[in-house]
Amino acid sequence: NLENFDHKVFLDGAKIAFETIINSFNNGDKSTLKGLLTGDVYKSFEKAIDEKKINPEYQFYSLTIEKIEDVIIENAIIKITVRFLSEQFKNNDESTVIKKQDLWTFEKPIKSKDPNWLLSST
């Protein structure tokens, strides 16, 4: 329901989802990912985990910026694209922090009463 949409609440949830998804992916935690991703995104994450394309030596450090970039309504689905700027470090060495920028799209049916959104694009 868009009438009650609160962008701050949405961004707070997106931040938590971002951190959870990054950490779950890096740890190969497919069960957590399954509940946070659309089917297609889950398949690509699952494939990367299975093919050991993940790089667990990088760990999430902090999220510095999250900003709504775009909102699209398509076929009764609302899609919100968020820009994240995060920092990650290598091999438990916080002196090796790298900055990463990501655009992620979250979606859910407009009429859904479920407060949760699914990651549909990275």
Regions found by a protein language model. Name each.
Residues 1-60:
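Core segments of small alpha/beta cavity-forming domains
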Residues 30, 52, 66, 70, ...:
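Functionally constrained cores in energy, signaling, and assembly domains
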Residues 54-92:
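Surface-exposed, charged secondary-structure patches
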